Amino acid sequence: MFGLGKKKKPEDPNSNEALEGESNRSNSVNDAAIQDESSLFARLKNGLSRTRSRLSDGLAEIVLGEKTIDLDLLEEIETQLLSADIGIDATDQIIDNLKKQLRRKQLADPKQFMTALRQELTDILEPVDVPLIIQSEPKPFVILMVGVNGVGKTTSIGKLAKLYQSQGLNVMLAAGDTFRAAAVEQLQEWGARNSVPVVAQATGADSASVIFDAYQSAKAKNVDVLIADTAGRLHTKDNLMNELEKIVRVLKKQDERLPDEVLLVLDATTGQNALNQAESFNKTTTLSGLALTKLDGTAKGGVVFALAKKLSLPIRFIGVGEKIDDLKPFKAKDYVDALFSE
């Protein structure tokens, strides 16, 4: 009787029910994040299956059947690493460090040896595990994409645009590969698919002029990220490499900091030749990062270690499939784990 007409007391935010509800919401978010990470790793693992078959499966065949670890075994390991495109410099470092551990009797059995080997591989990659951070100011953040024909440069631009869009950034593309009409059309197709504006001129136009126009447009429209394509050039052709220098000069006249990133796209299927390309490009223009494509189609994914050891350039992205979201930010530990995952 006396309770009629009284308002119900608001729920105490500190009550057990309120706390339980908040906890459930938090757990749902955490579970979704864990599931997403698990999915990403599964795709990375699947994309690296051919390299894993050559590298880790081959190593396991050599090591796991042995009762003792000795110098003769290390010679077999050295041969296996070289055949997996790890490269001479990286392989020498790995073997030298394993020999030191062997002398200190720290590699008593195959399991310890494989753990030590994985750590050596991770140690080579960790210094180049440097993500590309898009600075919010000044705008636009300019990424200049370079590389030889056929490495997947234009496709990588489309995938990068989608990645940055998913992060809530405004993106514009510059069709700076004016030598091939197909390249301009391909970039415009990527732009249309993702609703990203593309600045382009006629085939044969001056590439530096196209990128200059794109920069001016992006700046006026307050665009967050401008990704500029360039002509696929042979690293042995001086005239094309000189054109790349011109593009950089034109950008620096607008702002000395530009370009913010010079990203070299390399095809993993070329193995050690990718290293030669990177060295040549780095002489012409100062590279700030690498993107390694087509890892899903090759057993030569060991070249990542060769690049890391020889050049010490950040590996920004790796391509592990043909889907639009198969260009992934590079993570050293995940890469090694995927190579040795069963």
Where are the model-predicted features located?
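P-loop/Walker A NTP-binding module and the surrounding RecA-like catalytic core of P-loop NTPases
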Residues: 122-342
